[in-house]
């Protein structure tokens, strides 16, 4: 049968750490959580959009791999002719590529730009809908699924900044 019980109880307490201590604690927790994910018996890569979240993940990974004498491989994604047809909006005020280029230069990654045309994207629309079992926002899921299928040919472990926007304002 079914039963109803509480797994946990969230309580709110005042944050008493100083700003400096908070910054250091968050830095430690983020770095530690990323470094734990790159312990792997197969090569690891990252998705790099140039935003805050993927830049943090890629930067930490690149530094850790450099300590091991390895170079991080990063991937970014764009749509064919995006530089021609791009229109700024609230969701994406600028193109990603200039920020990707800055991060690649900063962390020294081996970077690959992957491009998707609209027919490839259309091929993944139904699969992405079926995977989520519901419609989602624009082409985000279908494009991610398409690009993951390309990266999966070389890498089995990929770290991303997905879902960190809400935490870091990316």
What is the predicted role of each segment?
Residues 9-170:
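ATP-dependent adenylate-handling active sites, centered on carboxylate activation for C-N bond formation
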Residues 1-9:
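Non-catalytic substrate-recognition/targeting regions of SAM-dependent transferases
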